[in-house]
Amino acid sequence: GATVLIGLTGGYPSGARGIKALLDSGEITQKQARRMLCFTVGAGPAFVISVTGSGLLGSVQTGIILFISQLSAALVLGILVGLFARGEEAPAEARGGASSASMPVSSALVEAASDGASSMISMCSFVILFSALLVILDQSGISSFLKEVFSSFGLPDRMASSLVPVLLEVTTGSTAAAAAGAGAPFLSFALGWAGLCVDFQIFSMLRSVSFSKAVFLLFRLFHGLLSALFTVIGLHFFPITETVFFSTGQSLSGGLALRA
């Protein structure tokens, strides 16, 4: 319960860290870890409401709708996963409790600090890697080529121009989408999808978990699409004035890259 809550509200990739901790302590099985991973990836409320809603779109109300949409999509996925998993094994008995309880405080502090530092270095490394990749794609003209490809399939230019960064890195993608005027539903998709940068952080963190990367990415896609759908519904019942979605990029472009 707590791990699911942290995964949905603690920001990327806190859910994966919680799953790893439960698996390492023997409180869940590999199957349960795989199921939890399908719906416990989410951005934190500070990033969604403050940065994306208030900062990029100019509306706290829109940010709240985005956050509720993301939570709703995750809950739908969690319910579906639970329905398909009904009748499978009961939760595993905790096997790591005794060793955790007997660990000296000094050792626990050292382990916690080492784990935190390792996670932070990993996160920063992937952010730098994907930021560099985006620059290479942009400078080489590949991003422009892909934009034309996306447009040829009927995707509006304001979405096609920012789809590559959205697919790769959520902060850069969200900023680009807002600057292009792609609208709240598209940003909601970006937040639900989370970007390959976050996905690779999770893959690195959960090397001990045997799971299909393709299935995981498919659930990320479903999460993004459901988030966008719920945002459309939310904006229908709680409409926001059009002025909210005007060019945020003029004042914010490039200024939020380090604020995720």
Identify the residue ranges that each predicted region occupies.
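Alpha-helical membrane segments and immediately flanking helix-loop junctions
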Residues: 1-57, 162-180, 185-209, 218-221
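Inter-helical loop and helix-membrane interface segments of multi-pass membrane transporters/permeases
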Residues: 22-30, 37, 54-57, 148, ...
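C-terminal transmembrane helix pair
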Residues: 46, 75, 182-260
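Transmembrane helix-loop junctions in multipass membrane proteins, especially transporters and channels
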Residues: 59-60, 78, 82-94, 139, ...
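Alpha-helical transmembrane segments
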Residues: 62-79, 259
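Intrinsically disordered, low-complexity non-transmembrane regions of multi-pass membrane transporters
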Residues: 86-114, 244-258
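Transmembrane helical segments that form the transport core of multi-pass membrane transport proteins
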Residues: 113-191
